């Protein structure tokens, strides 16, 4: 069954009362989305998820998925409860899980705590899972609404959705140029052509994404650290596309490889040459060439 088929099937099962109390649903889902974003950089490869528990129009619990391997958003919201959740409405950005993983199924916690209604932003993008939790909840007499701020909730999990549906990473390209189409002065002496806001955005992206990839020429010209400079930020894995293994051993990415992971993708098969980098803590990925460069299609599947 495809994801689209699963969505159609769930649409028939769900009691979609979006017109009634729509503004209230939107407001609480907006809060759940804001909570979910707090997990950026800490939950990969899991999705960002936020949850809000409401009883008699009052918020009694809030939570989000804070760290990979730890409690999911729904269980954190229940943990945060300041009143009995029995009869409450749960707003959650993503369909609750119904399988045993690093944590127990969230559907079990919802049922056990007597929650009366669950409002879901978007279904699980995994075609094998989409709609299953909805069905389980409905079978236990819980009202379910799906699709509140659906596009915003889908955008929250764009990285997770890409991987879970294709097995490939979500890639974001960062590119800066001047209004006349240049990326640097002809001498190469220019340091930045972007402003403070753009540079801050770069740091936020480094914190959010698992890896950052550059070509060897960037290393040769700039000797970048490729780290996250945000307070309490998380450093991404540094990936260097270096077909002929020209990255200098004195480069920052090599010298600090034991502190911040550095992966070098190369077509070089010389074991002794690769060992020099491995001694500094680098991980060498042997990737075939295509048109004289690293085959990115192959690299994306490693």
Predicted ranges, named:
Residues 3, 9-15, 19:
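Short, positively charged and aromatic/hydrophobic N-terminal segments
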Residues 25-44, 163:
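Short, basic/aromatic recognition patches
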Residues 45-48, 170-171:
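Short, small/polar residue-rich loop motifs at catalytic or cofactor-binding pockets
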Residues 49-55, 175-176:
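Short beta-strand scaffold segments in enzyme catalytic cores
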Residues 53-152, 237, 263, 268, ...:
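Zn2+-dependent cytidine deaminase-like catalytic core
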Residues 157-165:
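Flexible, polar/acidic helix-loop-strand segments at domain edges
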Residues 162, 173-179, 183-302:
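Active-site ligand-binding patch in enzyme domains
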């Amino acid at each position: 069954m495809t994801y689209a088929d699963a969505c159609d099937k769930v649409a028939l099962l769900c009691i979609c009362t979006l017109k009634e109390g729509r503004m209230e649903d939107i407001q609480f889902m907006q809060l759940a989305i804001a909570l979910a974003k707090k997990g950026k950089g800490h939950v990969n490869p899991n999705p960002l998820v936020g949850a809000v528990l409401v009883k008699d129009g009052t918020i009694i619990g809030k939570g989000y998925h804070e760290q990979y391997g730890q409690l999911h958003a729904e269980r954190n919201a229940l943990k945060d409860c300041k009143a009995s959740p029995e009869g409450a409405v749960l707003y959650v950005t993503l369909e609750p899980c119904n399988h045993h993983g690093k944590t127990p199924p969230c559907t079990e916690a919802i049922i056990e705590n007597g929650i009366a209604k669950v409002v879901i932003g978007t279904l699980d993008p995994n075609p094998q899972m989409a709609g299953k939790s909805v069905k389980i909840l409905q079978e236990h007499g819980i009202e379910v609404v799906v699709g509140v701020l659906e596009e915003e909730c889908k955008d929250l999990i764009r990285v997770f959705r890409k991987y879970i549906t294709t097995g490939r990473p979500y890639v974001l390209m960062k590119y800066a140029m001047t209004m006349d189409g240049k990326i640097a002065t002809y001498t190469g002496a220019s340091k930045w052509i972007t402003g403070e806001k753009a540079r801050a955005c770069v740091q936020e992206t480094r914190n959010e994404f698992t890896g950052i990839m550059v070509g060897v020429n960037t290393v040769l010209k700039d000797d970048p650290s490729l780290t996250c400079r945000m307070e309490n930020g998380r450093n991404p894995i540094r990936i260097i596309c270096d077909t002929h293994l020209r990255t200098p051993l004195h480069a920052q990415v090599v010298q600090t490889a034991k502190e911040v992971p550095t992966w070098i993708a190369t077509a070089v098969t010389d074991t002794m040459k690769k060992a020099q980098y491995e001694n500094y803590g680098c991980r060498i990925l042997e990737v075939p060439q295509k048109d004289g460069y690293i085959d990115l299609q192959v690299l994306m599947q490693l």
